[in-house]
Curated annotation (Swiss-Prot):
Subunit structure: The complex is composed of 8 subunits; MtrA, MtrB, MtrC, MtrD, MtrE, MtrF, MtrG and MtrH.
Annotated protein name in UniProt: Tetrahydromethanopterin S-methyltransferase subunit H
Gene: mtrH
Role description: Part of a complex that catalyzes the formation of methyl-coenzyme M and tetrahydromethanopterin from coenzyme M and methyl-tetrahydromethanopterin. This is an energy-conserving, sodium-ion translocating step. MtrH catalyzes the transfer of the methyl group from methyl-tetrahydromethanopterin to the corrinoid prosthetic group of MtrA.
Gene Ontology terms describing biological process: methanogenesis, from carbon dioxide; methylation; one-carbon metabolic process
EC number: 7.2.1.4
Length: 319
């Protein structure tokens, strides 16, 4: 294990802390709710869903947070403004921790930022995300909101290398004229979480993990990713699972995906990750123990270098 020479930022969002030296703070774990084809969603256009089931999922993740000490975040996904604003209003009622405002629609993200500001729970919110494709309207909407935390994506489509990821944060890289960190500061973001933008195996997955070390070593900022997307985009695994299903081994096909899906989060955690977007919140009882165990291994080795884990670290709760 190692210790960074660079002083490491620790940020606090809705009572949860992220960052620091490896082995100091437990890894934050963010589960996604209301994602595409989530069985609890009854109408994804109007944002109608099973409230009891949604609350149960959020509460289960909260229980895992209490058990392991790993900070929990709720990644709230909605495909349009109406749905996303309904979803975040509900989550704010039943959860007092951090939540990510997430959508493939810029209009939905803008509506969510505005709603969170008007309703008074912007301090819980993490914008997802500031990246090279953000336009002026979305940027200005973020400026006018009360949101102070955001995922900052270090992805340059023109340069997927580790150097390219650092450059896009600092000066815009090969795609834009403004660095993402400068853009975040101008938008009023005080608490940046750097997403190293994991790409598929064979297309830069390894560089993404290495970028975690580079960002912390050079900038000292909290880093993480949605690394579970790596097995989801792995063609070989998809074909392997198909073969298992055709052979009547349906359960094994599911298990293989779960192992790779949860295992990917361990890779990011060992790669000096401070947070992981682990995928469906339904998997909380799989993700939390796996990452807590990884955090404990890191903390044990880091103690020899003088790093002291916080009281809520899994190593102080699960032994």
């Amino acid at each position: 294990m190692f210790k960074f020479d660079k002083e490491q930022m620790v940020i606090e969002i809705a009572g949860r802390k992220f960052g620091g030296q490896p082995g100091e703070y437990p890894t934050g774990l963010s589960g996604t709710i209301f994602y595409a084809r989530h069985k609890i969603v009854e109408d994804e256009i109007k944002g109608i869903f099973d409230k009891s089931a949604a609350e149960a999922l959020i509460n289960k993740q909260a229980e895992m947070e209490d058990t392991t000490g790993n900070p929990a975040l709720v990644q709230v996904f909605g495909g349009n403004p109406e749905a996303l604003t309904k979803y975040i209003d509900f989550v704010a009622e039943v959860w007092d921790g951090p939540m990510l405002l997430d959508s493939t629609s810029g209009e939905a993200r803008m509506a969510a930022a505005t709603r969170a500001t008007e309703a008074g729970y912007a301090n819980q919110c993490i914008y997802n995300s500031i990246n090279v494709s953000i336009d002026e309207a979305e940027f200005q909407n973020l400026v006018e909101s009360d949101i102070e935390a955001s995922i900052v994506l270090c992805f340059d489509p023109m340069d997927p290398s580790v150097e390219g990821k650092l450059n896009v944060l600092l000066d815009g890289g090969k795609t834009t004229d403004t660095g993402m960190l400068d853009l975040a500061e101008k938008a009023g973001i005080k608490y940046p979480l750097i997403d190293v933008a994991c790409t598929p195996l064979g297309s830069g997955a390894g560089q993404s993990v290495r970028a975690s070390f580079a960002v912390k070593a050079k900038l000292g900022l909290p880093v993480g990713s949605g690394i579970h997307n790596i097995p989801s985009a792995w063609d070989w695994l998809r074909d392997f699972r198909k073969g298992l299903r055709e052979a009547g081994q349906t359960q094994l096909a599911k298990d293989v995906h779960h192992v790779c899906d949860i295992g990917a989060n361990i890779v990011q955690t060992m790669g000096s990750g401070d947070f992981v977007l682990y995928g469906p919140i339904d998997n909380a009882e799989l993700a939390f123990p796996a990452v807590a165990m990884t955090d404990m291994v890191i903390a044990e080795t880091a103690k020899d270098m003088g790093t002291v884990p916080v009281d809520t670290h899994p190593i102080n709760k699960l032994l």
